[in-house]
């Protein structure tokens, strides 16, 4: 009995998915705004199905009240009903919930001690001035170093693909300092930024975070602790 219910549910979901596929194809032809003339053959080409399948799906949509369909000697005319638009809108809202959150990602990392390089670079006025202007805060002279575990590396690689905030390189009498890509972030509600130098000897699984405060002290962190960083893309 339970298996029969599960099987029924599966086919119910499959039917809705198939209906949405056809509704979307019709909507892309402006059938939510006007009556469109379309043959079953044309629809079959749009959805990659046979002529018979396309005709059957149109009949199913009509039976469910999702479209109004009129057959005349001049052809087949279709318009999506309010019920059909509501089904499309619900699907749209589901996807909106998924992709609206794409503006941020969350990365977990293990705290570890660096060798003090972060303090040196963050203290350079050529960078600090841009941090204040572009990130909106004057950073504590130091970085929180995080080692990203393998299972989180997909999100770390995302940062390489994103544009981020460009911190321009500069030169002094002694040497040239390269560009840095930055992403604003939050750790336990505290603002900060991930900084990724274009030239670095650190491997890809290492991230450095700057903040107006010393994050280790503010959050009571020690080597080996894991923290979650919410990164704003």
From Swiss-Prot:
Positions that bind CDP: 114-119, 213-216
Keyword Glycoprotein attributed: no
Keywords of this entry: Flavoprotein, FMN, Kinase, Magnesium, Metal-binding, Nucleotide-binding, Transferase
Note on cofactor: Binds 1 Mg(2+) ion per subunit.
Keyword Chloroplast: no
Top EC class, one word: transferase
Entry's Gene Ontology molecular function annotations: magnesium ion binding; nucleotide binding; riboflavin kinase activity; sequence-specific DNA binding
Listed InterPro entries: AsnC-type_HTH_dom, HTH_CRP, RibK_CTP-dep, Riboflavin_kinase_archaeal, Riboflavin_kinase_CTP-dep, Riboflavin_kinase_dom_sf, WH-like_DNA-bd_sf, WH_DNA-bd_sf
Origin: domain of life: Archaea
Region: Riboflavin kinase, residue numbers: 105-233
UniProt catalytic activity: riboflavin + CTP = CDP + FMN + H(+)
Pfam family name, one: CTP-dep_RFKase
Residues that hold FMN according to the record: 200, 208
Residues reported in the UniProt entry to bind Mg(2+): 143, 145
Pathway field: Cofactor biosynthesis; FMN biosynthesis; FMN from riboflavin (CTP route): step 1/1
EC numbers, comma separated: 2.7.1.161
Region listing for H-T-H motif-like, in residue ranges: 1-104
SMART domains for the chain: HTH_CRP (SM00419)
Gene Ontology terms describing biological process: FMN biosynthetic process; regulation of DNA-templated transcription; riboflavin biosynthetic process
Cofactor: Mg(2+)
UniProt function note: Catalyzes the CTP-dependent phosphorylation of riboflavin (vitamin B2) to form flavin mononucleotide (FMN).
Family membership noted in the UniProt record: Belongs to the archaeal riboflavin kinase family.
Protein name: Riboflavin kinase
Gene, per the UniProt record: ribK
């Amino acid at each position: 009995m339970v298996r029969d219910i599960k099987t029924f549910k599966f086919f119910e979901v499959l039917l809705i998915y198939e209906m949405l596929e056809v509704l979307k194809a019709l909507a892309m032809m402006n059938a939510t705004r006007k009556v469109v003339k379309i043959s079953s053959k044309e629809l079959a080409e749009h959805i990659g199905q046979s002529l018979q399948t396309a005709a059957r799906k149109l009949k199913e949509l009509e039976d469910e009240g999702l479209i109004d369909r009129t057959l005349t000697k001049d052809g087949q005319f279709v318009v999506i009903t309010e019920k059909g638009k509501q089904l499309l809108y619900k699907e749209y809202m589901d996807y909106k919930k998924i992709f609206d959150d794409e503006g941020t990602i969350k990365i977990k990392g293990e705290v570890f001690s660096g060798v003090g390089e972060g303090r040196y670079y963050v203290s350079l006025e050529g960078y600090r001035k841009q941090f204040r202007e572009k990130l909106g805060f004057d950073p504590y002279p130091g970085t929180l170093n995080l080692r990203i575990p393998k299972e989180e590396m997909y999100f770390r690689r995302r940062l390489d693909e994103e544009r981020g905030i460009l911190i321009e390189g500069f030169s002094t009498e002694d040497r040239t300092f390269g560009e840095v890509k930055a992403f604003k972030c939050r750790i336990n509600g505290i603002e900060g930024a991930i900084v990724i130098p274009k030239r670095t000897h650190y491997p890809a699984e290492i991230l450095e975070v700057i903040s107006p405060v010393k994050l280790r002290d503010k959050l009571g962190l020690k080597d080996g602790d894991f923290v979650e960083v919410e990164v704003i893309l």
